[in-house]
């Protein structure tokens, strides 16, 4: 309908609004008008996806649009994708940027330029927001993509067996469907920044011959979750963390417990940092001076030797304390050390994937230094040592508080990683740092949003929370938030740990929630308080009929904790409940929980 006719019809717009609309549209060209119409349509339909926002641009300028999709359990993939989109925008490209979870898979056959950033979760699994697209590409419904040029940047951790597996899957499947790779697959380890930056440059160079730039019609379209928007507004990020103050680091396991679990409270002060329940806190830490001293002594290197890290000139000791990863091994380092030490034992071990995986889980760099001495001809000096070690990376902790309850504080539940090996005690880097922190100590932090672990929008929706050990942390935050909301929905907690008397984390809080009626029920499993071990998965099966009824009544289901064993065992228990009490086949049970996941009713925060 023509704008000049608006005022003469029964329009919901006032005359002033019509005049403003006329003034705006008079200044726009046809492509810009298409973009505005798509934007307004998406605004009117808030349930729409990021691709709906960009639909008009895609139709008007399909051959000139670069689509950038990201799939990531944390914010790393989104950060890389967004930085690429900004660079493409400055070069005059029209860009559609979206999470894979918000992308309409039916749009794929219309794409001509597609750039993917995707991480691998768990044991070779796609992250939550990439699952649908990942599965779609593996089905017969996936279209031929002969007109598509693409590139994939895969994020992973070489400490795990299925390194960058999801990225490999996307690359292989797109190629099989006829798409043409702009570049070979780029695989990034945890120190991904340099490789990602190089990919940005390379892929934009590769795109250039295929696209005509039109700087005046650039469109960068993205719909972000609320948490991502809030977090991005803060000046404090992973690269620029806030220097916060430790208020409390208190042991909350008993004196006779085999585990040292700390309740840590941190003051965010005037930082303006905001978090939602379900988010994580990124913690930068310093390695132990004792550990660094042991490494330097074992290598015969001077602590005060001057080295350059980035643009900074510091002592070798300080570089090892603040800049390099010392407490987590990875395959590349073990293999490099095997060659330097010429150890036949270590060389053989590095060629056996399973043995190497177990070795990495149970050793630190100092164990290589101590047990596999370097010959003089290895000639390892300070600079070569730093080249061997990858950069220190922050650790993520599920936040155990709600800002509606604690205001400018953030609470964590931290298990001290502590292992005895050959008569030596080895500590985890971040957990030891936080456990040792005194009141008033400085800690560098930032908020890592996790849109895949969110309470239901309706506070009257029932929730089932499964969190053994420190996996209970986000559920403490959930309960604080639900109480503040005045939630009427039922809530059910499954918790487990070795001993009732020593390891019942936040026991008095849960009892108070029960007494007040905020927590409807709690089922606990203390594995070593009886002859036979009982875990949360056993309690789930025991309460299967009630749990199934809760799910039929619309309950949202949450799991937090260990991904290696617990999450898998709990999932199997849930499948058994669906089979026994829902009358489903094994295949139908899997489909049932997949449907719950796709509707955000089955969410995991596992590590």
From Swiss-Prot:
Cofactor(s) needed: FAD; FMN
UniProt GO molecular function: flavin adenine dinucleotide binding; FMN binding; oxidoreductase activity; sulfite reductase (NADPH) activity
Record pathway: Sulfur metabolism; hydrogen sulfide biosynthesis; hydrogen sulfide from sulfite (NADPH route): step 1/1
Swiss-Prot/TrEMBL keywords: Amino-acid biosynthesis, Cysteine biosynthesis, Electron transport, FAD, Flavoprotein, FMN, NADP, Oxidoreductase, Transport
Entries under Gene3D superfamilies matching the protein: 3.40.50.360, NADPH-cytochrome p450 Reductase, Chain A, domain 3, Nucleotide-binding domain of ferredoxin-NADP reductase (FNR) module, Translation factors
Single GO cellular component term: cytosol
Flavodoxin-like domain boundaries: 66-204
Reaction equations catalysed: hydrogen sulfide + 3 NADP(+) + 3 H2O = sulfite + 3 NADPH + 4 H(+)
Chain positions recorded as NADP(+) binding sites: 527-528, 533-537, 569
Keyword Amino-acid biosynthesis part of the UniProt annotation: yes
Enzyme superclass (EC): oxidoreductase
NCBIfam families: cysJ
Task performed by this protein: Component of the sulfite reductase complex that catalyzes the 6-electron reduction of sulfite to sulfide. This is one of several activities required for the biosynthesis of L-cysteine from sulfate. The flavoprotein component catalyzes the electron flow from NADPH -> FAD -> FMN to the hemoprotein component.
Name of the protein described by the UniProt record: Sulfite reductase [NADPH] flavoprotein alpha-component
Natural source organism: Shewanella oneidensis (strain ATCC 700550 / JCM 31522 / CIP 106686 / LMG 19005 / NCIMB 14063 / MR-1)
């Amino acid at each position: 309908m023509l704008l000049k006719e608006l005022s003469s019809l029964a329009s919901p717009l006032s005359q002033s609004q019509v005049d403003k609309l006329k003034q705006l549209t008079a200044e726009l060209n046809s492509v810009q008008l298409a973009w505005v119409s798509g934007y307004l349509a998406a605004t009117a339909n808030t349930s729409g996806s990021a691709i709906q926002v960009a639909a008009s641009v895609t139709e008007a300028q399909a051959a000139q649009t670069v689509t950038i999709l990201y799939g990531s359990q944390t914010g790393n993939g989104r950060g890389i994708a967004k930085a690429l989109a900004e660079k493409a925008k400055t070069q005059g490209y029209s860009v559609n940027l979206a999470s894979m979870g918000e992308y309409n898979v039916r749009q794929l056959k219309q794409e001509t330029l597609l750039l993917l950033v995707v991480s691998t979760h768990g044991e070779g699994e796609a992250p939550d927001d990439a699952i649908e697209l990942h599965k779609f590409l593996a089905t017969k419904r996936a279209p031929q993509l002969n007109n598509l040029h693409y590139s994939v940047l895969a994020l992973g951790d070489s400490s795990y067996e299925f390194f960058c597996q999801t990225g490999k899957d996307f690359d292989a499947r797109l190629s099989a469907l006829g798409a043409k790779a702009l570049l070979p697959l780029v695989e990034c380890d945890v120190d991904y920044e340099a490789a990602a930056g190089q990919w940005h440059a390379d892929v934009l160079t590769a795109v250039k011959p295929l696209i005509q730039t039109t700087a005046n019609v650039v469109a960068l379209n993205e719909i972000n979750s609320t948490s991502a928007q809030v977090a991005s507004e803060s000046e404090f990020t992973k690269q620029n963390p806030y220097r916060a103050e430790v208020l409390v680091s208190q042991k909350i396991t008993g004196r006779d417990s085999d585990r040292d679990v700390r309740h840590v409270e941190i003051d965010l002060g005037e930082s303006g940092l905001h978090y939602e329940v379900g988010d994580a806190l990124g913690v930068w830490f310093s390695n132990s001076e004792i550990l660094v001293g042991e490494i330097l002594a074992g290598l015969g290197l001077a602590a005060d030797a001057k080295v350059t890290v980035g643009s900074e000139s510091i002592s070798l000791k300080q570089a090892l304390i603040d800049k390099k990863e010392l407490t987590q091994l990875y395959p590349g380092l073990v293999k490099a050390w095997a060659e330097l030490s010429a150890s036949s034992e270590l060389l053989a071990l590095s060629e056996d994937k399973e043995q190497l995986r177990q070795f990495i889980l149970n050793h630190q760099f100092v164990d290589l230094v101590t047990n596999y001495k370097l010959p003089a001809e290895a000639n390892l000096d300070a600079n070569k040592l730093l080249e061997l070690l990858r950069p220190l990376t922050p650790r993520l902790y599920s936040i155990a508080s709600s800002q509606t309850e604690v205001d400018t504080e953030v609470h964590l539940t931290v298990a001290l990683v502590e292992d005895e090996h050959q008569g030596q005690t080895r500590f985890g880097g971040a957990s030891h740092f936080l456990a040792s922190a005194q009141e008033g100590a400085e800690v560098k932090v930032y908020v890592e949003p996790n849109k895949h672990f969110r309470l239901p929008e309706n506070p009257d929706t029932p929730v089932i929370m499964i969190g053994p050990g420190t996996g209970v942390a986000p559920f403490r935050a959930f309960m604080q938030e639900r109480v503040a909301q005045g939630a009427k929905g039922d809530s059910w907690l499954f918790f487990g740990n070795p001993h009732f008397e020593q390891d019942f984390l936040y026991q008095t809080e849960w009892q108070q929630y029960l007494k007040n009626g905020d927590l409807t029920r709690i089922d606990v499993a203390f594995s070593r308080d009886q002859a036979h071990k009982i875990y949360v998965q056993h309690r789930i099966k025991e309460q299967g009929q009630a749990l199934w009824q809760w799910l039929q009544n619309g309950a949202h289901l949450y799991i937090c904790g260990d991904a290696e064993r617990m999450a898998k065992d709990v999932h199997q228990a849930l499948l058994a409940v669906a089979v026994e009490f829902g009358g489903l086949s094994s295949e139908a049970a899997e489909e049932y929980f997949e449907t719950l996941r796709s509707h955000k009713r089955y969410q995991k925060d596992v590590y």
